């Protein structure tokens, strides 16, 4: 049987990795030869979840057409966030919870996108719809994905469906969602030992906003100053990325997981759009973004609107 690769976006977060594992397992149960893979390094937060539930992480691939003809995308759809040679393979399915942009196919496909906080929430439904029992380890990974995407249920992207799914999955996994979740988020917020290049690419996504090319990277921290003490070095590596990729804006967002506020570091010739979008003034290229924790709901649409205004 021909193999199908299942993967999330570049610079994968916990949902991208864990949903690839969970969906590949569901597809295997349904008779498909599916393998989860990843398009980037595994973060400290995701590694914590994999270690806790004793699951091996997916192998890394840069290209997919050299291995398979067919792929399944989870937790993304935009071409620039996907495999480098995504145009050379057929996308069979997409399971996602983000905006739909820069995506088209030559054939009809199964496309499932729901306005929930996490891909794993959708997968929880799909396991039930197919009458497949979720293994304890996989339930733990799916729970981890929801906790990560919802910032332990505090993000405005978090829905009642996400909370309900998390409670169900926690029961299957045999953990307390709140206690486990805090430990996992703290592990993700431990940025010691990371280079500046790693920091700005841990969870970075590229977007087309009107005519502007924008990259938004986000890291969680227990104290934003732990990250911003390296601002000069960060600006140097960000400026290099801006030049290399021809970006109009690189927004590096440091989110405090205790206060649920963020600080944005904006570099690029369109940095002023951040000021317009949030009605703030950049001082030394930074501004506090009160109550902003979600890239998907509080950054991407706000900036997109500002660029198109």
Swiss-Prot record:
UniProt-annotated location(s): Cytoplasm
Binding site for Mn(2+) 1: 9, 13, 75
Keywords of the record: Cytoplasm, Hydrolase, Manganese, Metal-binding
Co-factor remark: Binds 2 manganese ions per subunit.
One matching Pfam family: DHHA2
SMART domains, alphabetized: DHHA2 (SM01131)
Positions bound to Mn(2+) 2: 15, 75, 97, 149
Enzyme Commission number(s) of this protein: 3.6.1.1
GO terms for cellular component: cytoplasm
InterPro entries recorded: DDH_dom, DHH_sf, DHHA2, DHHA2_dom_sf, Mn-dep_inorganic_PyrPase
Stretches that traverse the bilayer: none
Main subcellular location of this protein, as a coarse class: cytoplasm
Gene3D superfamilies found in the cross-reference section: DHHA2 domain, inorganic pyrophosphatase (n-terminal core)
PANTHER family: BNIP - RELATED (PTHR12112), MANGANESE-DEPENDENT INORGANIC PYROPHOSPHATASE-RELATED (PTHR12112:SF22)
Family: Belongs to the PPase class C family.
Protein name as catalogued: Probable manganese-dependent inorganic pyrophosphatase
UniProt organism field: Bacillus cereus (strain ATCC 10987 / NRS 248)
Gene encoding the protein: ppaC
């Amino acid at each position: 049987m021909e193999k199908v690769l299942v993967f999330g976006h570049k610079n994968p977060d916990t949902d991208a990795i864990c949903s690839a594992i969970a969906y590949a397992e569901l597809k295997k149960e349904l008779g498909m030869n599916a393998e989860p893979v990843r398009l980037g390094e595994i973060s400290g937060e995701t590694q914590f979840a994999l270690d806790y539930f004793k699951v091996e992480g997916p192998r890394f691939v840069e290209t997919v057409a050299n291995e398979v003809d067919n792929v399944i995308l989870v937790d993304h759809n935009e071409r620039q966030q996907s495999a480098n040679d995504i145009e050379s393979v057929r996308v069979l399915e997409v399971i996602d919870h983000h905006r739909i942009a820069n995506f088209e196919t030559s054939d009809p496909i199964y496309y499932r996108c729901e306005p929930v906080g996490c891909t794993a929430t959708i997968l929880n439904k799909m396991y039930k719809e197919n009458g497949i029992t979720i293994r304890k380890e996989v339930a733990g990974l799916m729970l981890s994905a929801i906790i990560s995407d919802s910032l332990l249920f505090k993000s405005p992207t978090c829905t009642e469906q996400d909370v309900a799914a998390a409670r169900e999955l926690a029961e299957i996994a045999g953990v307390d969602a709140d206690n486990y979740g805090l430990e996992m988020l703290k592990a993700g917020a431990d940025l010691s030992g990371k280079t500046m290049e790693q920091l700005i690419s841990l969870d970075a996504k590229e977007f087309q906003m009107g005519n502007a090319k924008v990259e938004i990277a986000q890291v969680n921290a227990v104290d934003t100053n732990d990250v911003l003490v390296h601002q000069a070095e960060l600006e140097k590596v960000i400026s290099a990325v801006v030049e290399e990729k021809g970006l109009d804006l690189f927004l590096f967002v440091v989110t405090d997981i205790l206060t649920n506020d963020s600080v944005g570091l904006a570099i690029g010739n369109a940095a002023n759009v951040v000021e317009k979008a949030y009605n703030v003034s950049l001082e030394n290229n930074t501004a506090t973004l009160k109550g902003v924790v979600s890239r998907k709901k509080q950054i991407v649409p706000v900036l997109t609107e500002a660029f198109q205004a």
